[in-house]
Each structure stands twice: as structure tokens, then as C-alpha cells.
UniProtKB/Swiss-Prot annotation:
Protein family (similarity comment): Belongs to the Cu-Zn superoxide dismutase family.
Lipid-linked residues (S-diacylglycerol cysteine): C18
Name used for this protein in its record: Superoxide dismutase-like protein YojM
Membrane topology: Lipid-anchor
Domain of life: Bacteria
Disulfide bonds listed in the record: C93-C186
Pfam hit, one: Sod_Cu
Subcellular location, principal: membrane
Keywords: Cell membrane, Copper, Disulfide bond, Lipoprotein, Membrane, Metal-binding, Palmitate, Signal, Zinc
Lipid linkage positions (N-palmitoyl cysteine): C18
Cellular component GO terms held in the UniProt record: plasma membrane
Effect of substituting P104H: Leads to copper binding and enzyme activity
Amino acid sequence: MHRLLLLMMLTALGVAGCGQKKPPDPPNRVPEKKVVETSAFGHHVQLVNREGKAVGFIEIKESDDEGLDIHISANSLRPGASLGFHIYEKGSCVRPDFESAGGPFNPLNKEHGFNNPMGHHAGDLPNLEVGADGKVDVIMNAPDTSLKKGSKLNILDEDGSAFIIHEQADDYLTNPSGNSGARIVCGALLGNNEKQ
């Protein structure tokens, strides 16, 4: 009898738990990587390292959800590393340090990092998780960016924007770029980057 009563109580608890809704995502969560058809991308950016060697590319398109979808395919990176990845305010990749790209893309004047209670820069992107072969190939979403002329969030304005890979992981908190170290790879997005 006790076993039957215990079994009925456990069953009732299990059924009651099924109707619970998933809690909403926290406001400053790291955007998830996505699956998107790569043929739909309209802007192509070549990536170069500090020696000037081509090490991959980035493709960009307006997202069906919000912001931009960014496809990055890169090689010759540190195997197994987690590397900071950001959008910078100028489409310039002067070697060897890529400082010509200026500061982080931040048209909304926020603080840096997905874990920062003051919000995050529009140019903050998730860390790149490099494979054991030194390669990364991923599509991610940048919700606070656009290619629309006249938009404050447009990364394709008069001076373009740059995509930068850093030498270390972004801690998602520290200004201005999450303690992610030197800029080691750069790709400049300018008006002539449209895919043919």
C-alpha cells in the first residue's frame, strides 16, 4: 500500500512538472551559433594574419531573425584555443598590429562583454573555439548590427568595419575587449566586399 501511494505521488509530481515553462534567457547572454545556408551570404571579407598571409574569410548577410549572420572560416590558428572575436569601427587592417581598425564597434555607447550588467558593445561576438587542426568554421548572429544605410547599427558605413580575432579568449566583461590580448587576424569590410 505504501509503495502504491509513493508511486502515485511521484507520478503526480512528474506530471505537474511537465507543464512548467522554460525560464526566459538572461538579457546579456552570449549569442548562440546558428545553422544558415552559406550560399545566401552577400558580403565576403578576406582574413589576413600579422604577416599578411590569407588565413580564411568571413561572409555576412542580414539575418532572418535580427541583426547579421556572420559565417567565419579560418585556419592557421592556435589549435584548441578559445579566441576573442569582435567587430571594430573602421574597415582598415594595417599590419602588423591592426590598430588602424580603431576601437570596438559601439554605436550605442555600451560597456564591453556579454556578462557586463551595463550591456555589451554591438561588436561583441562569441569566442571562436578552434579545432585541434587550427581551424574554425562557424556561423553566428550579431543582433545589434546591420547593413542598412542610415542605420546607427550599420557596419558598412563610409569607413566600413573590421573583424578582428584576438590571441586569447574574451572574458565577456573587461573593457574594451575582454582581456583578449593582441589583434592577430583582421578582415576589412568595405563597400567593395559584395559577393559576385
